[in-house]
Amino acid sequence: VNNKVAQDTFTPGWLRSVGQGWIVWGLESFIDEVAVKANKDPVDFRLAMLDGKGKQGGKAPESVGGATRLANTLEILKKKTANVKLGADEGIGYSVSAGQERTMPAWLATAAHVHVNKRTGKITVKKLWVVSDAGIVIHPDGAMAQLEGSLLWGLSLALFEHNEVKNGQVSKTNLHTYLPLRMNDVPEMDIELVESEEFPVGLGEPGVIGVAPAIGNAVYQAI
């Protein structure tokens, strides 16, 4: 998905997960909208498209299995969230992300459980899940730390960090007004690394990009 419109509007700087941060947000939100219009379950709707055929097939050595590996992470995630009991004004949203066109791809499925206060509009994330296939995990503790940090950064970007441009410059210039995620906003997290014997790939960035669309899709379900 090309981000030409964004490039024509402003010049983005460096950020963990770079351009994919907003591309996947738009793409995965749109897929949920299509699923709703088609009266399909959003997870099953995605799984039906992830058949690993054609361009989805992957290539040796770094992306053997292609989209079938992404489908596997989503299947695992579906089972993890199957028995979650939702309260009033709560929802669970899903997203998937993969870097299959890059030389260091990873396949991830993300879910978010949210509560929406319909009176105030406040969104509370109660739990985040992520299932990741990054091939052989060389350093499990390091991989887990990467994904924990990714989920928290993604949550911070989605709900907390915001900076308006006024008169040609950003309006918030220090941390007393630019507020990132705080410790008391950290939700429960469930992270699973898929056991694999395939080529090991990077986990530094892909965990960030699935959080915002999962939250957005959960909010839609909640309201």
Outline where the language-model segments fall.
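C-terminal catalytic domains of large/alpha subunits in multi-subunit enzymes
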Residues: 1-103, 109-111, 115-223
